[in-house]
């Protein structure tokens, strides 16, 4: 009698964040189905968990229109080859992890061949290009969403979606140790501390750094003991920031950090940051914040017409109200930013109320996402 084929899960991850999610999912699945087989496009973490890599993740990790166009032929070849090989393999479930421009079409190809498909991490369809939801619905059997308002959006369009909570909320403690973080960064326990996070992209650092630095200078006048910490994502962004600081605020003492954004947030009394995932991480660090964002006028004009949400920051979208002050475009200027940050640095009622709400929101999205994702995969595999 032929041996029964082990549970076979195909996965495609296109960048580091997807590799981390994929590794967590594989770990959770192996705990329940030890002989399961995992194949696809994987990074080093997924491979370390036992995923057989038909292609290296770096093949898909291209950013920007110019880079994508330069690699388009190769990307299309990989997608066609994966469609053929997965169709021959007939995995029990295919999981496309993020990388929506690559994965959603691949999921559609496989669904037509009778393969069950999951898209793990919802694209921001609730915010812009909402019509993508119809293609997602045609291409997948299930979307796994990090945030409850994402599931509510898919429900409106009758697209099967499961809210699994956020892996970052699982990884971060409900009550972070501020003094321990300060010890790591060399910041006195009794000092006021402000984190500046001017973004991870070059354009963001260019547009925001000067205003953020001038804001810190204004706040230092009110709080002479103010410690300023600036985590920067890589050496390139650090060099860019240092150049701007030398022009705008050469005398402002600041701790420039290589990475360590999470430690900086936990250590700080308040943060001034660009929108994006950093705002969610800051909420989970229980650090009161102000979001400041500026873009080129035409880009902003276009964004206002395309973006369908009332708020830009994830804490506000989760809360359904303006929990965090958002100062955009001409509002994003030092005087207004400083005025918004002052009550947070005072560590009074405003920051305590924000902290308590952050903790409630953290609990809402702390659902053991790896296990929930594994549940969804196994249910679909039956």
Swiss-Prot record:
Pathway: Glycolipid biosynthesis; lipid IV(A) biosynthesis; lipid IV(A) from (3R)-3-hydroxytetradecanoyl-[acyl-carrier-protein] and UDP-N-acetyl-alpha-D-glucosamine: step 5/6. Disulfide bonds: none annotated. Keywords: Glycosyltransferase, Lipid A biosynthesis, Lipid biosynthesis, Lipid metabolism, Transferase. GO terms for biological process: lipid A biosynthetic process. One of its GO terms (cellular component) is membrane. One of its GO terms (molecular function) is phospholipid binding. It comes from the Bacteria. Its EC number is 2.4.1.182. It catalyses: 2-N,3-O-bis[(3R)-3-hydroxytetradecanoyl]-alpha-D-glucosaminyl 1-phosphate + UDP-2-N,3-O-bis[(3R)-3-hydroxytetradecanoyl]-alpha-D-glucosamine = lipid A disaccharide (E. coli) + UDP + H(+); a lipid X + a UDP-2-N,3-O-bis[(3R)-3-hydroxyacyl]-alpha-D-glucosamine = a lipid A disaccharide + UDP + H(+). It holds the Pfam family LpxB. HAMAP family: LpxB (MF_00392). PANTHER family: LIPID-A-DISACCHARIDE SYNTHASE, LIPID-A-DISACCHARIDE SYNTHASE, MITOCHONDRIAL-RELATED. Condensation of UDP-2,3-diacylglucosamine and 2,3-diacylglucosamine-1-phosphate to form lipid A disaccharide, a precursor of lipid A, a phosphorylated glycolipid that anchors the lipopolysaccharide to the outer membrane of the cell. Belongs to the LpxB family. This is Lipid-A-disaccharide synthase. It comes from Salmonella agona (strain SL483).
